[in-house]
Design a protein with these regions (language model features):
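Hydrophobic pocket/interface hotspot
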Residues: 21, 25, 87, 94
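Short beta-strand/turn micro-motifs at beta-sheet edges
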Residues: 1, 61-67
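Conserved segment of winged-helix/HTH DNA-binding domains
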Residues: 54-62
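Vicinal oxygen chelate
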Residues: 1-4, 7-16, 67-140
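Generic structural signal for well-ordered beta-strand positions
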Residues: 34, 55-56, 102, 125
Length: 140
């Protein structure tokens, strides 16, 4: 019998503004809807990176409530980007849309250069460059 190590395959978020969240993750993260279904009177949507549909998805479910994190809470979803300029571009876009949370900043390795953005349901999203994570990392 083969024993498999647990592997992270998805994160599920119950959100209040499903369509706005879909649009946000499509616009900021280039995710696309890889699956959608109704579940009773609620909708369930899987958002994926192209080519990773069977590796990792973000599941979004309608009918949730915005739950802003407590003051000083740093929980977030992290996305690696290709350059510091891309971090700056996303931060500028977020500022224009009124959802910039943390302006770009440089931290010592392994944190790198990053900014923070709020999605329409109040989830914190980090865009970073220079971390040893993701397909574009120096360690990959």
């Amino acid at each position: 019998m083969t024993i498999y190590q647990p592997r992270l395959t998805h994160i599920a978020l119950h959100v209040e503004q499903l369509d706005e969240c879909i649009q946000f993750y499509q616009s900021f993260c280039q995710l696309y809807v890889s699956h959608e279904r109704a579940s009773g009177n609620k909708r369930v949507v899987w958002l994926s990176e192209r080519g990773r549909e069977h590796d990792f998805v973000m599941v979004m479910m309608s009918g949730g409530h915005n739950l802003p994190p407590p003051e000083g809470d740093y929980r977030h979803l992290g996305f690696a980007v290709a350059s510091k300029e891309e971090v700056d571009r996303l931060a500028e876009k977020a500022a224009e849309q009124g959802c910039l949370l943390w302006p770009p900043r440089q931290e010592p390795y392994p944190v790198g250069y990053y900014c923070g953005v709020l999605d329409p349901s109040g989830n914190q999203v980090e865009f970073s460059y220079g971390q040893p994570l993701g397909s574009g990392s120096p360690a990959a």
